[in-house]
Amino acid sequence: MQIRFTKMQGAGNDFVVLDETQGRLGLTPAQYRYLADRHFGVGADQILTVRPSPAEGIDFEYVIHNADGGEVEQCGNGARCFARYVRDKGLTDRDTIRVQTLAGVIAPRLTPDGRVTVDMGRPRFDPAEVPFDASGLAPAARGAGQTWPLALGAGADAQVVDVAVVSMGNPHAVQLVGDVDAAPVAHTGPLIEGHARFPQRVNAGYLQIEDRARVRLRVYERGAGETLACGTGACAAVAAGIRLGLLDARVDVRTRGGLLTIAWSGDPSESVFMTGPATTVFEGQIDIPDAP
């Protein structure tokens, strides 16, 4: 099976973008995994699919598959690339589009400087909405927020980390670290991602605060491992930091792949806004194995 694709990246978070506006490709999880494979396929953190929307007032459907082939609710860096793609391909002439995701409707906006701002919706901190099983745990209050003790491992190797849990349409667990470069992401990231208290698994964020307007962040993404950047992870980390009284309303987030700017008023009823780059890397076509 031969398909055309566009390779894009936003702050180093890289994507294969597929156009299904003229018909479904009908790919299987195994075929998504093949596309994402960096040795045999194109290579990507996620596969993004553009589909027409049947709903009035919605321009497109935005479908996201992780590198493991599983469909997920949201991807912030991908949303910026999605908006850049549909505009560059002439699928819309609008600067602001309304896009349906599994997590709800988002509204990416192309800015005059070439970046893209996305209304990512409001953050949710209720453990049940993340979802996070908080039964039997005592939270530690700080500012208007709270952190939860999360036990990792068992026996002599067990450790407890304090995490703020946030949903940005997908689940996040954010922990504060003194030095993000020294954070044990490769070791504890998988333990947090698959922790039994997160029934849908979770994205694990490691947040270093430099001052009230600047942070550094690494994220071990659910179904993808550590990536160079995670847009929803940046939104979740900043929202958690503001909620805990540690950050101001506008924060520059330095990831290993580049800079994102996150803005949130601190009002739980209001949206988080993310601004960052979206770049086309190359286009091509690839033969992928037919579905069994």
Curated annotation (Swiss-Prot):
Pathway the protein acts in: Amino-acid biosynthesis; L-lysine biosynthesis via DAP pathway; DL-2,6-diaminopimelate from LL-2,6-diaminopimelate: step 1/1
Origin superkingdom: Bacteria
Keyword hit for Isomerase: yes
InterPro entries per record: DAP_epimerase_AS, DAP_epimerase_DapF
Pfam families on file: DAP_epimerase (PF01678)
Biological-process GO terms, alphabetical: lysine biosynthetic process via diaminopimelate
Record EC number: 5.1.1.7
Compartmental location: Cytoplasm
Sites marked Could be important to modulate the pK values of the two catalytic cysteine residues: 172, 221
Any one GO molecular function term: diaminopimelate epimerase activity
Chain positions recorded as substrate binding sites: 13, 46, 66, 76-77, 170, 203, 221-222, 231-232
Catalytic residues (positions): 75 (proton donor), 230 (proton acceptor)
GO cellular component: cytosol
Reactions accelerated catalytically: (2S,6S)-2,6-diaminopimelate = meso-2,6-diaminopimelate
Gene3D superfamilies: Diaminopimelate Epimerase, Chain A, domain 1
UniProt KW keywords: Amino-acid biosynthesis, Cytoplasm, Isomerase, Lysine biosynthesis
Main location: cytoplasm
Function: Catalyzes the stereoinversion of LL-2,6-diaminopimelate (L,L-DAP) to meso-diaminopimelate (meso-DAP), a precursor of L-lysine and an essential component of the bacterial peptidoglycan.
Family annotation (PANTHER family): DIAMINOPIMELATE EPIMERASE, DIAMINOPIMELATE EPIMERASE, CHLOROPLASTIC
Record-stated family: Belongs to the diaminopimelate epimerase family.
Subunit organization: Homodimer.
Protein name per the record: Diaminopimelate epimerase
Organism name: Paracidovorax citrulli (strain AAC00-1)
Taxonomic placement: Bacteria, Pseudomonadati, Pseudomonadota, Betaproteobacteria, Burkholderiales
Gene, per the UniProt record: dapF
